[in-house]
Amino acid sequence: MNPTGSYKDRIAAATIEDALRRGLRGWIGTSSGNGGASMSAYGAKAGLPGFLCIAADAPPEKVRSIVPYGATLLPMSQLGIAEMDAIRELASEFRLKLSVTAYRYNPEGMSGSEAIGSELINQGEFTHVYVPAGGGGLLVAVARGLGGASTARLICTQPEGCDPIVRFLNREIVEPQIVSCTSTISGLQLPAPPDGKLAASAVRETDGWGCSVSDADAWLMQDYLASKEGIFVEPASALAAAALANDVKSGRLAATARPVVILTGSGLKDMRRFRSTDLLTQRMFTIADLRPRLEAIDASEPPARR
């Protein structure tokens, strides 16, 4: 179980454990939302004060979920490599644990997510693992967790409007870094991913590939997973599933393949798409309004068992 609704609880648990072991005074970090919620929760449990530099455009749901834990929130208009390096210096100066979900800054914490790979091995045979990538750290963690126990190919999935690792894998750019992002997918908007090269190396070592997916395809997959599978995930998670669907349609993925998709966070983390769908502000219904709707169901074929 991930108490705050994303896999980053694993990273936070390992990060706080390292902070306590080293006798640090608290923690400081950056986040687009999920990592901040995780660190704030685990930091509160450990009694360690936290200072979170959060992206100013983070989804309100993510920000609100952090507030109850009591960490100090510092909204920032920009959180690039320069800002992260500066925060690392402050962490060292004030004896705080640096909490950034990247091996480049927090290898001890990132090790907490490597168990995802080893847990996959216990689930049975699989041939491909589709992983959403922002900074690239999760993909690296999955690769390290799999180790030599699996021959599965790793597939790096990113939004078309922010896909430096995919473009680097495709040899379109010489560094996994671009000037800016146009994607609106929260958590995947990193033009200069700190673990970009590590992630690309992990993909190449498994003979995998990169997939760029439109924001629109990610949203469609989010709706599909919720309405057909009963799984409500945030757009960043749905993007990886959309990449799989696109590879199936194009024939890139063989019919005999047994793919796995890493779904990283709950859909309750980012509800921006659904704010205009406020059913409580529409007209009220009566019991009499139910009959025509129920009759429509009665006339349809029952769903086949899956």
Q: Model-predicted segments: where are they?
A:
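PLP-dependent amino-acid enzyme catalytic core
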Residues: 1-306
